[in-house]
């Protein structure tokens, strides 16, 4: 790789690091090329990506960001999994690590915060943004329906009482 190609690679890595909601760093020693290709396809389908790059280039790209500490993770055969949605990259990484024991999640970055391996696993267990929205909407809808029933109950009781009073007067 010549100097110009390295410069292009560094700028591409900087763009990925700055525009992603989350980035996960992992070791892939012992993983076949076919398995990495499969993980790249899975990440693309989920709205993310997987990038294998020379550690030195990634360290240079990270140097100008607010998460310089993550550069310590780039030792050995490392790759990055990234996504705009903060939960997608951790989910992809942890799922791939569960299927492939040689794939080791080291840590990562979530919106300018450096995370360790345990934090990545916790984030991966969360529902994605659409799932969170569905939970919030269902809670709002349930509470709105319950409130409507509570507000209409006294009116219904008054109407029933008046109806009974009218029926009683008609009979007399």
From Swiss-Prot:
One of its GO terms (biological process) is translation. It holds the Pfam family Ribosomal_L10. One of its GO terms (molecular function) is large ribosomal subunit rRNA binding. Keywords: Ribonucleoprotein, Ribosomal protein, RNA-binding, rRNA-binding. The keyword Ribonucleoprotein applies. GO terms for cellular component: ribonucleoprotein complex; ribosome. It comes from the Bacteria. The keyword Chaperone does not apply. Belongs to the universal ribosomal protein uL10 family. Forms part of the ribosomal stalk, playing a central role in the interaction of the ribosome with GTP-bound translation factors. Part of the ribosomal stalk of the 50S ribosomal subunit. The N-terminus interacts with L11 and the large rRNA to form the base of the stalk. The C-terminus forms an elongated spine to which L12 dimers bind in a sequential fashion forming a multimeric L10(L12)X complex. HAMAP family: Ribosomal_uL10 (MF_00362). This is Large ribosomal subunit protein uL10.
């Amino acid at each position: 790789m010549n100097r110009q190609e390295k410069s292009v690679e560094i700028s591409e890595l900087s763009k990925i690091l700055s525009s992603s909601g989350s980035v996960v760093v992992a070791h892939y020693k012992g993983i076949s090329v076919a398995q990495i290709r499969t993980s790249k396809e899975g990440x693309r389908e989920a709205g993310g990506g997987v990038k294998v790059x020379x550690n030195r280039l990634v360290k240079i790209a990270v140097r100008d960001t607010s998460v310089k500490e993550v550069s310590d993770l780039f030792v050995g055969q490392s790759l990055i999994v990234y996504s705009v949605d903060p939960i997608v990259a951790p989910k992809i990484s942890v799922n791939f690590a569960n299927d492939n024991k040689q794939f080791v999640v080291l840590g990562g970055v979530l919106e300018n915060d450096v995370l360790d391996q345990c934090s990545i696993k916790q984030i991966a267990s969360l529902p994605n943004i659409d799932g969170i929205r569905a939970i919030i909407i269902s809670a709002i809808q349930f509470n709105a329906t319950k409130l409507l029933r509570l507000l209409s109950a006294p009116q219904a009781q008054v109407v029933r009482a008046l109806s009974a009073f009218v029926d009683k007067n008609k009979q007399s």
